[in-house]
C-alpha cells in the first residue's frame, strides 16, 4: 500500500513538472545569457529560481548571441575564436563545444529551426550578408538568398516552412521577405523600412519594426484568410509615439506582445494585446530595461536592466510583479534566452 501511494505521489509530481515546464530538471528552465564578468564575453546559464549561474564557455575569445535549441539540450552561439565570427554550439553542461561553420568571412545570428534539424544564419562570405541554412546532419551550409543588399535574419515560422528576413536599400529591395528553404518561393511581404520580424507561435501574425522619419513603431502583418502569405498582406499599426517602440517578443500563447518603449524618456518594458490594445507598462525607473524574453510557459519574463549601471539579468512575472535581480556584478550581462 505504501509503495502504491509513493508511486502515485511521484507520478503526480512528474505531471506537475511537465505542466509547469519549470523546475524538476526541465532543460529549458535555465536561462542562457552573455556575461563579461571575466573580462571577455562568455556564455552562461543561470537557474531563475536559485540564481546559481554556470559558465558554458571559458576561453580567450568573445562568445555572444546564445540561443537554446528547441529540445533544450544545446546552445548555439557566435564566437570569434578563429579570427572570423563563426557559429558554435555547446551542450547544456558546457562539456562539448563544436564549431559548426568554418568558412571565410563572418557568420552570425544563428537561429534554430522549430524541429532543431537546421540552423539558419547570416554569412558574409560572399562580401555581403546573406541567409544560409546549415542542416545538422550534413553540416554543409546552403545559401538561400542571393542579392546585393544585406539581409538581416528575423524568425522561422512555427511550422518551419518559412524564414522571415529583412533588407535595406531601394523600394524594390527593402522591407520584409519570406523564403521557404526547402523550395523556391520568395515573397516580398512589405516594401518599407521594416525589420526584426517575429512570428507569433500560432503562425497567424508577424510583428515587426517600421522606421518612419527616424522613428520606430511596431506593426503587425497577418496572413490572408486562405492561410497564405502574399504581398497584399493585411497590416495593423500597433504603436504610435514620438519615441521608439521596438524589441517585440510574443507570449507562448500568442495573445500578448512584450516590447521596449522609449516613450517615457528611457527604455521600459511594456505588454499589449496582439491588436495593440491594453498597453501596460511593466517596469518603472530612470534606467533602460531591455531585451524581454518570455519563459517557456509564459508565466515569467527575463530582461536586461541598467538600473545599477552595467546591464544585469532580471526576471519578473508576466504582469510585472515579483521583479528580481539574478546577476550581481559590475560587468555587462545581456542577450538572455529562456
Residue spans of the language-model regions?
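Bacterial N-terminal signal peptides that target proteins for export
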Residues: 2-11
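Bacterial N-terminal signal peptides
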Residues: 11-21
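Sequence signature of WD/YWTD-type beta-propeller architectures
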Residues: 24-338
Amino acid at each position: 500500500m505504501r509503495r502504491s501511494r509513493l508511486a502515485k505521489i511521484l507520478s503526480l509530481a512528474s505531471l506537475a513538472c511537465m505542466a509547469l515546464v519549470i523546475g524538476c530538471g526541465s532543460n529549458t528552465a535555465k536561462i542562457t545569457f552573455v556575461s563579461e564578468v571575466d573580462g571577455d564575453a562568455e556564455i552562461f546559464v543561470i537557474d531563475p529560481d536559485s540564481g546559481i549561474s554556470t559558465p558554458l564557455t571559458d576561453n580567450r575569445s568573445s562568445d555572444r548571441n546564445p540561443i537554446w535549441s528547441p529540445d533544450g539540450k544545446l546552445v548555439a552561439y557566435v564566437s570569434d575564436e578563429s579570427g572570423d565570427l563563426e557559429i558554435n554550439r555547446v551542450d547544456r553542461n558546457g562539456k562539448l563545444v563544436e564549431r559548426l561553420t568554418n568558412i571565410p568571412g563572418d557568420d552570425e545570428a544563428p537561429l534554430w529551426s522549430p524541429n532543431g534539424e537546421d540552423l539558419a544564419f547570416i554569412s558574409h562570405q560572399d562580401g555581403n550578408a546573406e541567409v544560409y541554412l546549415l542542416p545538422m546532419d550534413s553540416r554543409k551550409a546552403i545559401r538561400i538568398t542571393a542579392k546585393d543588399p544585406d539581409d538581416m535574419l528575423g524568425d522561422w515560422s512555427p511550422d518551419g516552412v518559412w524564414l522571415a528576413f529583412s533588407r535595406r536599400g531601394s523600394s524594390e529591395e527593402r522591407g520584409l521577405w519570406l523564403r521557404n528553404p526547402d523550395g523556391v518561393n520568395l515573397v516580398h511581404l512589405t516594401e518599407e523600412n521594416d525589420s526584426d520580424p517575429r512570428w507569433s507561435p500560432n503562425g497567424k501574425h508577424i510583428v515587426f519594426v517600421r522606421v518612419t522619419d527616424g522613428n520606430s513603431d511596431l506593426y503587425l502583418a497577418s496572413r490572408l484568410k486562405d492561410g497564405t502569405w502574399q504581398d497584399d498582406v493585411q497590416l495593423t499599426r500597433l504603436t504610435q509615439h514620438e519615441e521608439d517602440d521596438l524589441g517585440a517578443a510574443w507570449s507562448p500563447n500568442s495573445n500578448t506582445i512584450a516590447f521596449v518603449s522609449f516613450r517615457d524618456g528611457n527604455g521600459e518594458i511594456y505588454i499589449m494585446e496582439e491588436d495593440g490594445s491594453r498597453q501596460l507598462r511593466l517596469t518603472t525607473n530612470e534606467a533602460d530595461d531591455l531585451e524581454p524574453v518570455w519563459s517557456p510557459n509564459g508565466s515569467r519574463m527575463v530582461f536586461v536592466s541598467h538600473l545599477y549601471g552595467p546591464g544585469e539579468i532580471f526576471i519578473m512575472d508576466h504582469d510585472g510583479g515579483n521583479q528580481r535581480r539574478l546577476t550581481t556584478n559590475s560587468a555587462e550581462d545581456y542577450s538572455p534566452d529562456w
